[in-house]
């Protein structure tokens, strides 16, 4: 693994930045760093393919793959460029790499690659679409809520689910959803995290929530709620910068929340005071899930558009984790820890899947990746997750697929929200057989 972004490491090592000093403009990705350079090269390769400038397309896609070798979009551009340049063997190798990472593709969308397909590649493509593994359905909720976040009180097993459709934090009593805390119209509840008797909730206004009015100022708050009474104990917001909060994580000493609109990760030190910017704008396209190691000195953040990042909370160093050759780390949403392993919800790669990533002791490298569950009828747009003992509890079917971008139901009888369970000690090892998102839309 190589050291990324020295300037960012210096910023973080010198101390986090106050929110008030940041500009309020739309998200800008720094062109001098990995994500900015990668995006520029990807655009260059795509334009060159369109213009049939094959040598230029090959060069640009090669440079982009040096930065991000598991990018499905660029692997396909590489295959197209090489096919156009008459380098059939190299083009086939790019296509083989793409499929080896478990991704699927519509063959009809890439007619120029038709001569490359053979029985072995067809077999791999078909295998990549097949379901893997199973999970136990432990809750089914028929009412349309669009469940995003989940939190479990470990001792009692009490389940809390966030809802976007009508903006609420719900508690499950005897298998039935009951509102614990309702939000103002147009404001949805996203990530949830429990710490003692406090339920921390990331909230944001958005089109999917009933009553949303784009003419009104955007709302983004983290709420500290008494999990028993549902009363708000404290509110935390950033008055200086428009935000859209998504995932949240209750760390050993600090709280973290991702802002998918601004591309930043914020920290609430000691669970009090004001937000500090841990990862500033320019380095991630759409930060999502967050999780600390057991010691609480390393934070892993998933960027939907570029993979997983390791932040040393003592030194401020940030490095991107390299994907094993048989997976891509793009499109990962929620994260949780089981021992030294990471459990990841990957809903940006189809079919949807739940992964277990075996990490080195220092969390600097991924030694192996396993697909716990992939596809199947009950797994659709999975979202929030939590490990309780040796069980993974997760939102297997969130109902995101049942609503349009404006929150309108797509059917008079939407499917249920499903909470699933996986016994992490009994799952057999599996080989992941894994197109590529830039950001979760319309989620934060």
Regions inferred by a protein language model and the residue ranges of each:
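Beta-rich, blade/repeat-based domains predominating
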Residues: 141-157, 185-207, 238-256, 282-298, ...
């Amino acid at each position: 693994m190589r050291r990324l972004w020295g300037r960012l490491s210096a910023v973080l090592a010198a101390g986090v930045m106050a929110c008030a000093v940041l500009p309020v403009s739309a998200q800008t990705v720094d062109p001098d760093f990995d994500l900015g350079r990668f995006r520029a090269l990807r655009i260059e390769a795509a334009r060159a393919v369109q213009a049939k400038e094959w040598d230029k397309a090959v060069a640009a896609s090669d440079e982009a793959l040096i930065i991000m070798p598991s990018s499905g979009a660029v692997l396909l551009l590489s295959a197209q460029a090489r096919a156009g340049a008459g380098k059939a063997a190299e083009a086939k190798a790019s296509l083989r790499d793409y499929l080896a990472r478990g991704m699927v593709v519509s063959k009809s969308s890439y007619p120029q690659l038709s001569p490359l397909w053979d029985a072995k590649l067809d077999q791999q493509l078909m295998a990549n679409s097949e379901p893997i593994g199973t999970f136990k359905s432990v809750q089914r909720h028929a009412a349309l809520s669009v469940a995003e976040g989940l939190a479990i009180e470990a001792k009692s097993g009490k389940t809390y689910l966030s809802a976007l459709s009508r903006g609420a934090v719900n508690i499950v009593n005897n298998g039935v959803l009951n509102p614990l805390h309702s939000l103002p119209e147009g404001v949805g509840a996203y990530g949830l995290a429990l710490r003692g008797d406090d339920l921390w909730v990331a909230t944001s206004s958005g089109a999917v929530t009933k009553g949303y009015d784009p003419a009104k100022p955007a709302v983004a708050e983290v709420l500290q709620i008494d999990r028993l009474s549902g009363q708000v104990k404290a509110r935390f917001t950033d008055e200086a910068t428009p935000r859209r909060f998504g995932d949240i994580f209750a760390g050993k000493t600090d709280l973290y929340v991702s802002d998918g609109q601004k591309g930043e990760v914020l920290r609430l030190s000691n669970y009090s005071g004001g937000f500090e910017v841990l990862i500033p704008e320019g380095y991630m396209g759409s930060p999502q899930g967050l999780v600390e190691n057991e010691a609480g000195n390393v934070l892993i953040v998933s960027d939907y558009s570029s993979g997983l990042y390791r932040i040393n909370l003592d030194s401020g160093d940030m490095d991107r984790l390299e994907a094993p050759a048989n997976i891509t780390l793009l499109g990962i949403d929620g994260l949780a820890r089981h021992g030294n392993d990471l459990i990841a919800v990957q809903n940006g790669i189809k079919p949807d899947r739940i992964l277990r990533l075996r990490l080195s002791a220092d969390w600097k490298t991924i030694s192996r990746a396993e697909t716990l569950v992939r596809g199947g009828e009950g797994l659709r747009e999975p979202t929030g997750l939590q490990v309780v003992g040796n069980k993974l509890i997760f939102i297997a079917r969130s109902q995101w697929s049942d609503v349009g971008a404006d929150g309108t139901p797509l059917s008079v009888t939407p499917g249920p929200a499903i909470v699933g369970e996986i016994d992490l000690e009994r799952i057999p090892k599996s080989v992941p057989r894994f197109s590529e998102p830039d950001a979760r839309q319309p989620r934060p």
